[in-house]
Amino acid sequence: MRKLGIIAVLSLLVTAFAAVPALAVTNFDNAPSGAHYRTGSAEPVCTLSGLTVTCTGTTIGGVGNTNATVNLAVTSTFTGTCTNRGGHLVEPFTESETTTTTSVITSTRNGQLIVPEQSATGTSSEEFLATFECPNPNWTATISGTSISFLYTLTFAGFTEPAITISGP
């Protein structure tokens, strides 16, 4: 029962982090010459709601026949302790799990890259506890903190660095 209360509080804390703005950088030096956001389009905006990160779509013009790869990685980091049967804390832990979605976007006939909305969901406390094992099977794991972070990148074929990078929170 205590574990469920802690999980509920941690879920609220994760939601509170959603108000933190993401850091976005567009560098069209890492794109085909002439690449630009099409009129009416802008840099994608990523938002965190609960465990899910959603990044808006965009359209990039002037890319010729160059395709791009979009990655969205959501990392859930859990801190906590393992407790023995006597109630003593015996082993602290910090573990991270990353969920990644990858899409290859093909340029259109007129040299535009239409990037759809991207979404990925991090690992919940319940999912983490279902698979995490303390070093001793007789110990019980308790989560005391959770954080969510994400990294969105759009990298053009033939380039080693992303043209768009968004990280948060």
Set out the residue ranges of the language-model regions.
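Bacterial N-terminal signal peptides that target proteins for export
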Residues: M1-A8
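C-terminal segment of classical bacterial N-terminal signal peptides
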Residues: V14-L23
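Mature extracytoplasmic or otherwise solvent-exposed domains
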Residues: A24-P169
